[in-house]
């Protein structure tokens, strides 16, 4: 045995050095035990072709030693057993099949001797087109908030499990083996639910599948599988009917997409209701729907009236007829009528009759039709612009009494610089000037700070009052002083 494994491992190492193999597969093979490795190479022809350089049209078989394990094994006997390979053609394989059956029975007996009370289930996976089994997916419902997504995952997973059990009934003949398979193919909360729940082990594998499915629906979707099945079916049928009624086909080029949608929804309904929904399908087809409906009524049979594909085939044939008619009508436009009289097979029945002719009048190039020019509509309103002065224009500031704007002006009372007349500290000593200033301001005059450059005119004002003889004596004395009073402005 050890020598056999050593020989096979040498072949595997050679294939690794040549980079002609899958590294993961080689590592997995080398991690097997001696008996499992030799058995795997004996059962799978592809491994022997790939690593042991066998031809595809031959079958090789590695014969195990029939000696008892208590007897000592020598290296020479192992080498002779390894090199004694029975090579036979495919047509002469009766002896090889018998030896393979004996080998399988021996291997099964050894496994039962290791654990005589319970044998773990060994599933072969889902059958595929290539002949090899594909591993089923592991169910993990952790952190999936959508109940619809959970329902789809659970249904798909249970379909795969039921397919494995039905195709391998000998391996999964008890409910305990089915539960073990489900436990190994779940993760997270689904696996803990299978472990913690109490199951009836004495029931059949088919019933244990239904119980686990009911438990999954209750715990992870919140539905009673037995009671909600009818409600879910009614809801599904109602929704499909609404979608079929609302659907419409506007462009006949989208016939395939429309038919795909219609076929998906019609299969959600009951089978006996198919004919009336197919009639509705034909009525939704534009242009040729009426002709297709008439053909369907005349050509349908007891079986084809339930087929949506039969209705679509009629529609496609009508579309082909319509397209051919369009092509011929385009060709007839270019056909000359002069050839009809020459090539006519019927005798001439009209004599001296004028044929209706259509004259084409050419329009003179002098007169051309007047075409109004297109004008774009203004989407804005024209605003009246106001005059906005630029940076070189500014308003004239009003002049002040003191244009310089500072306290260097000369006082009008004391003729000193540094203060204004209203702040003059010498007002008491110049009361006469103050009176004249107040009187002039009341009359609307203002004193000038700068010297007057124009012609200066001086006016005098005399006040004459009618007095009595008694008062003339007093006024004569004061007349000298009053005559000298002059006001200059």
Swiss-Prot record:
A zinc finger (CCHC-type) spans 409-426. Residues 87-101 have a biased composition (Basic and acidic residues). It is found in: Virion; Host nucleus. GO terms for cellular component: host cell; host cell nucleus; T=7 icosahedral viral capsid. The keyword Phosphoprotein does not apply. Its main location: virion. PROSITE patterns: ZF_CCHC. A motif (Nuclear localization signal) lies at residues 107-110. Residues 87-111, 466-489 are annotated as: Disordered. It comes from the Viruses. InterPro entries: Caulimo_coat, Znf_CCHC, Znf_CCHC_sf. GO terms for biological process: symbiont entry into host cell; viral penetration into host nucleus. Keywords: Capsid protein, Host nucleus, Metal-binding, T=7 icosahedral capsid protein, Viral penetration into host nucleus, Virion, Virus entry into host cell, Zinc, Zinc-finger. GO terms for molecular function: nucleic acid binding; structural molecule activity; zinc ion binding. Belongs to the caulimoviridae capsid protein family. Interacts (via nuclear localization signal) with host importin alpha. Self assembles to form an icosahedral capsid, about 50 nm in diameter, nm, composed of 420 subunits of the viral capsid protein. The capsid encapsulates the genomic dsDNA. Following virus entry into host cell, provides nuclear import of the viral genome. Virus particles do not enter the nucleus, but dock at the nuclear membrane through the interaction with host importins. This is Probable capsid protein.
């Amino acid at each position: 045995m050890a020598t056999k494994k050593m020989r096979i491992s040498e072949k595997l190492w050679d294939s690794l050095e040549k980079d002609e193999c899958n590294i993961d597969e080689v590592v997995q093979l080398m991690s097997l035990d001696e008996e499992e490795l030799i058995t795997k190479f004996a059962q799978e022809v592809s491994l022997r072709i790939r690593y042991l350089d066998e031809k595809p049209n031959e079958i090789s078989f590695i014969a195990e030693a029939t000696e008892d394990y208590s007897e000592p094994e020598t290296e020479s006997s192992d080498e002779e057993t390894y090199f004694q390979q029975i090579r036979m053609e495919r047509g002469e394989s009766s002896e090889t099949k018998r030896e393979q059956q004996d080998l399988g029975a021996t291997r099964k007996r050894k496994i039962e001797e290791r654990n005589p009370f319970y044998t773990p289930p060994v599933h072969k996976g889902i059958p595929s087109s290539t002949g090899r089994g594909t591993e089923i997916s592991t169910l993990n419902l952790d952190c999936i908030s959508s109940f619809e997504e959970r329902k789809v995952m659970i249904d798909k997973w249970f379909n795969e499990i039921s397919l494995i059990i039905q195709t391998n009934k000998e391996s999964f003949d008890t409910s305990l083996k089915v539960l073990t398979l489900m436990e190994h193919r779940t993760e997270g909360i689904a696996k803990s639910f299978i472990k913690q729940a109490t199951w009836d082990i004495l029931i059949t594998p088919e019933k244990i599948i239904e119980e686990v499915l009911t438990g999954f629906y209750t715990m992870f979707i919140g539905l009673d599988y037995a009671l909600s099945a009818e409600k879910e079916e009614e809801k599904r049928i109602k929704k499909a009917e609404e979608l079929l009624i609302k659907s419409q086909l506007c462009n006949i080029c989208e016939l395939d997409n429309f038919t795909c949608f219609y076929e998906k929804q019609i299969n959600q309904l009951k089978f006996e209701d198919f004919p009336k929904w197919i009639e509705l399908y034909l009525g939704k087809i534009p242009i040729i729907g009426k002709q297709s409906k008439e053909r369907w009524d005349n050509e349908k049979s007891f079986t084809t009236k339930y087929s949506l594909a039969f209705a679509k085939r009629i529609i496609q044939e009508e579309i082909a007829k319509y397209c051919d008619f369009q092509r011929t009508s385009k060709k007839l436009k270019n056909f000359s009528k002069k050839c009809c009289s020459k090539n006519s097979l019927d005798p001439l029945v009209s004599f001296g009759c004028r044929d209706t002719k259509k004259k084409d009048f050419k329009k003179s190039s002098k007169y051309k039709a007047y075409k109004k020019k297109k004008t774009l509509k203004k989407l804005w309103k024209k605003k009246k612009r106001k005059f906005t002065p630029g940076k070189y224009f500014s308003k004239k500031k009003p002049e002040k009494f003191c244009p310089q704007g500072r306290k260097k002006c000369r006082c009008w009372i004391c003729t000193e610089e540094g203060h204004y007349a209203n702040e003059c500290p010498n007002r008491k000593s110049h009361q006469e000037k103050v009176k004249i200033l107040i009187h002039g301001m009341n009359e609307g005059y203002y004193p000038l700070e700068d010297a007057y450059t124009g012609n200066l005119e001086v006016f005098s004002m005399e006040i004459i009052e009618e007095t009595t003889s008694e008062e003339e004596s007093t006024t004569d004395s004061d007349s000298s002083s009053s005559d000298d009073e002059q006001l200059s402005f």
